[in-house]
Amino acid sequence: MRSISTLLFIISTFISLVSALQLAIPATTNPDPFCIRDFVQEEQMVVVNIKTNGNSGDGQRLDLRIVDSLGNEYRRKNDIAGSVKIGFTSHNSAAFDICFTNQLERKWSKNTNFVREIELDVESGAAARDWNAVQAAEKLKPVEVDLRRIEETTYEISGELQYLKAREERMRDTNESTNSRVKWFSILVITSLVGLGAWQVQYLRHYFKVKHII
């Protein structure tokens, strides 16, 4: 029984292990957004954990914006500092961007050495759930919690594979439709060129006959 529990713990730890990203964003007077992209399925819960150094009023203003590839904005937060936790549920299966801008205040415009360090951790689906709360609410044993977590993670992986398969089929259908259109367009162009060439030959023959050249 212990070996099974140990194996489940190792598997669940491996599945849920996500290394936090370490970012260093310099402060500028006209900053460009620095974005991290991830993919999420429809109606999937996402939790974004952010830890930054510095504090409000230190000459830098770190702003955050989370938006997906379809234009849906999930969060916008200005002048973040310290630890910030943001949760949201996706509207569609799409990629989403977590974008930071680090604005340098004007009074420090001559100082180009300001940098805001960020530790970013993004969890989605089963990894984003509070399993301690689930265990307490449903009175589950640790092994049962691990099994539930693995089950949900497996279901999510299966869903992602189904999405990728459906996407590949749509792309294949699009390619086949495009190839068919290109084929018929090529036939039309060739037919038009042949017809134009035949017309030019007839026109030149008529012209030369009228001019008594042939």
Swiss-Prot record:
<dbReference type="InterPro" id="IPR015720">
    <property type="entry name" value="Emp24-like"/>
</dbReference>
<dbReference type="GO" id="GO:0000139">
    <property type="term" value="C:Golgi membrane"/>
</dbReference>
<feature type="topological domain" description="Lumenal">
    <location>
        <begin position="21"/>
        <end position="183"/>
    </location>
</feature>
<dbReference type="GO" id="GO:0015031">
    <property type="term" value="P:protein transport"/>
</dbReference>
<dbReference type="InterPro" id="IPR009038">
    <property type="entry name" value="GOLD_dom"/>
</dbReference>
<keyword id="KW-0813">Transport</keyword>
<comment type="similarity">
    <text>Belongs to the EMP24/GP25L family.</text>
</comment>
<dbReference type="GO" id="GO:0005789">
    <property type="term" value="C:endoplasmic reticulum membrane"/>
</dbReference>
<dbReference type="GO" id="GO:0016192">
    <property type="term" value="P:vesicle-mediated transport"/>
</dbReference>
<feature type="topological domain" description="Cytoplasmic">
    <location>
        <begin position="205"/>
        <end position="214"/>
    </location>
</feature>
<keyword id="KW-0333">Golgi apparatus</keyword>
<keyword id="KW-0931">ER-Golgi transport</keyword>
<keyword id="KW-0732">Signal</keyword>
<feature type="domain" description="GOLD">
    <location>
        <begin position="33"/>
        <end position="124"/>
    </location>
</feature>
<feature type="signal peptide">
    <location>
        <begin position="1"/>
        <end position="20"/>
    </location>
</feature>
<keyword id="KW-1133">Transmembrane helix</keyword>
<keyword id="KW-0472">Membrane</keyword>
<dbReference type="Pfam" id="PF01105">
    <property type="entry name" value="EMP24_GP25L"/>
</dbReference>
<protein>
    <recommendedName>
        <fullName>Endoplasmic reticulum vesicle protein 25</fullName>
    </recommendedName>
</protein>
<keyword id="KW-0256">Endoplasmic reticulum</keyword>
<comment type="function">
    <text>Constituent of COPII-coated endoplasmic reticulum-derived transport vesicles. Required for efficient transport of a subset of secretory proteins to the Golgi. Facilitates retrograde transport from the Golgi to the endoplasmic reticulum.</text>
</comment>
<keyword id="KW-0653">Protein transport</keyword>
<feature type="transmembrane region" description="Helical">
    <location>
        <begin position="184"/>
        <end position="204"/>
    </location>
</feature>
<keyword id="KW-0812">Transmembrane</keyword>
